[in-house]
């Protein structure tokens, strides 16, 4: 991905995906339990995913056995799938999902990457204690129309590094979410605003599930699942590279991200009257009988002609 210019590796999101679709195999020793979106323990595949938040493309994906959120699992995943690909000096920020809440995980990411880490925090006993301390101080400020935020700085054990802890509360329901960042030089508002950069990994995982069949590995053994994930990653990178060389402005989002596979498939293949022939050069020739109102197919033809 880096060689073809579709990955920068500067701002990286780390996420975890629980695929309970194979929970019908509770007796299979290749599976272990994991909480799904509802918090219920199910037998599942649990890939961990690295995403480039700036270019909106996958960096790596790996099958995880055992406790996927344990410090040892995160260490193994990052050492084998992140730092062998991206030099820590290149990374400017890591955004972590709440599934990785834990002081050891945070300390590992901070020390190993030598960069700033921002994350949503699951409310375990320590986070709840910090939350109550922050709320008691009562130093709230408005954040949008429905929320208010408060913060305090804490010191991480072992490193002595300052960590800005933020409570975001819904003013109508009093529901709270917690966030944290090593960016103690940022205001709480700026930290929350910058955390949105992590969102592409959420839509990216949905794209992998819907268009690349991430949740449908051809088997239950770790080897087959790992191979499936590798093929999914290559397929997504191939499409991202294709979009980068085609440079079709009509397929760019307002954030200048390229469209997803389903958009390409619809524009090129859906509801099209076509004729397939062999031209004078002996090549297969696909002719769109309904024309090319958007000019996309003409641009694609020019690209393919150059690459013959």
Regions found by a protein language model. Give the residues of each.
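Active-site-proximal, Lys/Arg-enriched surface segment
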Residues: 1-51
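Short, conserved catalytic/metal-binding motifs centered on acidic residues
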Residues: 8-22, 56, 91-101, 117, ...
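Short acidic, glycine/serine/threonine-rich loops at helix termini
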Residues: 22-31, 104-108, 129-133
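Electropositive, glycine- and tryptophan-enriched low-complexity nucleic-acid-binding patches
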Residues: 36-87, 176-177
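Domain-level cores of phosphate- or acyl-group-handling catalytic modules
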Residues: 65-129
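A short, flexible helix-boundary coil/loop motif
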Residues: 138-156, 235-308
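Short, solvent-exposed helix-loop connector elements
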Residues: 187-195, 210-227, 246-251
């Amino acid at each position: 991905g880096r060689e073809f210019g579709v990955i920068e590796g500067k701002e990286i999101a780390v996420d975890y995906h629980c695929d309970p679709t194979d929970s019908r195999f509770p007796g299979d020793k290749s599976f272990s339990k994991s909480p799904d979106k509802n918090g219920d323990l199910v037998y599942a595949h649990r890939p961990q995913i690295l995403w480039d938040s700036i270019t909106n493309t996958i960096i790596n994906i790996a099958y995880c056995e055992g406790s996927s959120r344990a410090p040892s699992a995160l260490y193994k995943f990052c050492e084998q799938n992140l730092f062998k690909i991206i030099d820590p000096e290149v990374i400017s920020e890591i955004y972590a999902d709440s599934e990785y809440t834990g002081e050891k995980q945070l300390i590992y990411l901070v020390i190993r990457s030598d960069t700033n880490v921002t994350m949503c925090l699951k409310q375990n006993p320590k986070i709840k204690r910090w939350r109550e301390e922050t709320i008691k101080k009562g130093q709230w400020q408005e954040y949008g129309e429905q929320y208010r935020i408060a913060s305090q700085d804490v010191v991480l054990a072992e490193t002595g590094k300052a960590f800005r802890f933020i409570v975001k509360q819904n003013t109508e329901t009093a529901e709270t979410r917690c966030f944290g960042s090593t960016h103690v030089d940022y205001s709480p508002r700026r930290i929350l605003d910058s955390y949105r950069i992590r969102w592409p990994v959420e839509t990216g995982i949905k794209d992998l599930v819907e268009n690349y069949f991430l949740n449908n590995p051809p088997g239950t053994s770790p080897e087959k699942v790992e191979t499936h994930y590798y093929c999914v990653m290559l397929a997504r990178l191939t499409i991202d590279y294709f979009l980068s060389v085609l440079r079709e402005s009509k397929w760019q989002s307002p954030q200048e991200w390229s469209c997803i596979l389903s958009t390409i498939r619809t524009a090129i293949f859906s509801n099209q009257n076509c004729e397939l022939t062999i031209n004078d050069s002996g090549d297969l020739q696909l002719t769109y009988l309904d024309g090319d109102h958007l000019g996309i197919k003409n641009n694609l033809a020019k690209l393919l002609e150059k690459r013959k």
